[in-house]
Amino acid sequence: MKPFAFDYEKPATIAEALALLGEAGDDAKVLAGGQSLGPMLNMRLVRPRRLIDITGIPDLHQITDDGDAIVFGACVTHAAIEDGRIPDPTGGMMPNVAAGIAYRAVRNRGTIGGSLVHADPAADWITTLAAIGAEVTVTGIDGQRRIAVDKLMVSTFETSLVAGELLVSIRVPKLSSDAKWGFYKFCRKTGEFAEAMSAVIVDPARGDIRVVIGATDTRPVVIADAATLISKPESIATVIEENGLANDAYDAQVRRVSLWRAIEQVMP
């Protein structure tokens, strides 16, 4: 199938993009890489009257060192992160995660910002960046605001952005040199959507211990008492049950295994 006819716009600045979004309202879609939106357009799952391609905006490709964090422009590609072409604030976690996203052709075009706004529960970045404690900056006609990544996704394919807002950057805290991380996802074969995913951060210098379970039926689950879970991994099954992640025996098992294998990576 092919998409319905739409007007194609390629703004050169964030201000131009916001103006176009303001004019089009709910009839517009933003193209940041197209690896998810493209197939949805072709299958006519979305039918925008205007497509706004933001990949030509230089500010959205910038990388900035912000002291205790690295700020990624929304249009930084998965491949750029995988290849180490930009600074890594996570001690190898982000390149590792990027390398496991779909296929190289997808990683060449797909973007970190596009993935976050698409809000697919099975996507890698929403879970990973929630565990790291990252924030996104969104811009609209009323100014800028920051949203913690673990609060960005409201439900499946829905974010807390409002009409006319554009995600412009992602602020990723620098992990300390003695930080440990774990990440594990389960797919039936390479390139498929994850059926289970877990991310763990233990950063003593920042006093930060976070465990996030992704690839759920909705937004990632941030475990409230992560320190206890890591010190008592035998409680994994209970955590899965208490967070409503044991929909059936299969789901419960793959999520238990995913969580254990991520935790195992940070254990002494």
Regions found by a protein language model. Give the residues of each.
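C-terminal structural segment of proteins
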Residues: 1-268
